[in-house]
Regions:
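Positively charged
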Residues: 1-150
Length: 150
């Protein structure tokens, strides 16, 4: 595994829409492993492929230590409620803001074995899933920020 360089705001790759993963290869699996290591090293709870310079629909989320959710071609299939909470981003260091996100989401994705699964979450997990999927569509949390936090 290798720690990857995290792309910072201002790099145009963060504003591009990622392409779906057509086939899961050993390189895809290695990218997932490297993204997990990079996310943990940066003390984050999520990381999307464009944040490490890769325009593919891949993300990892870990809001509970040791419980990594690997997402390949994720799609939000259901959402409910609303929450306004503080968010940050590894690509936008030292900047925080309150965003409005769904309170609960269900996401369908594939895992590293190519198996389709669904994950549902509320509160922090819902925010993290939405945040990472936004990255795959070229969106940053500052785009939906309703209030900056000093």
């Amino acid at each position: 595994m290798a720690k990857l360089k995290i792309v910072k705001m201002g790099d145009e790759i963060l504003r591009k829409v990622c392409r779906p993963v057509e086939k899961i290869t050993p390189r895809t699996v290695m990218l997932l492993d490297d993204m997990i290591e990079t996310m943990r090293d940066a003390d984050g709870c999520g990381l999307a492929a464009p944040q490490v310079g890769i325009l593919r629909r891949i993300a990892v989320v870990e809001v509970e230590p040791g419980q990594v959710i690997e997402l390949i071609n994720p799609k939000i299939i259901a959402f409910a409620g609303q929450q306004e909470e503080q968010e940050g981003c590894l690509s936008i260091p030292n900047r925080w803001g309150v965003t409005r996100r769904p309170k609960h989401v269900t996401v369908r994705a594939m895992n590293r074995n190519g198996e389709t699964f669904e994950v549902s979450g509320s509160d922090l997990l819902a925010r993290a899933l939405c945040h990472e999927i936004d990255h795959l569509d070229g969106k940053l949390f500052v785009d939906c920020m309703i209030k900056e936090v000093e």
